[in-house]
Amino acid sequence: MTVCRVASEAELRLDGDLVFIGKTDEEYSLVCSTVCSGTQSVGQTVEREDGWRCFRIRGVLDFSLIGILAKISAILAENRIGIFVVSTFNTDYVLVKAENFDRAMGLLAAAGYSVTE
């Protein structure tokens, strides 16, 4: 996976299975497959960071649930694994650097979490 800062939302494409576009008053961001990153942003990329892998919390998360992501991030932080998180209406997607992915999955499984790539 790739995380990009892009110049504008113009011509950003939603091709691919996992694409997130973020817009604030300060920036536009794109998260997508590294393979697709060149075609997703069509020359709009200002800065990018490759080498992420993604897992999601299995199941639909009710908005009344509290602390799920905080607990997951605490487990990973205690083991010095940085995260980048994006969310949809149904669930959260956690990105970790590829070299930490297997260890992160093992730590979360040992803590009883059901996550899927």
Task: Indicate where each model-derived feature is located.
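Short low-complexity, flexible loop/linker segments enriched in glycine and/or proline
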Residues: 99-101
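A generic structural motif
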Residues: 28-32, 91-97
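A short glycine-rich beta-strand->turn/loop micro-motif centered on a GG-aromatic cluster
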Residues: 82-90
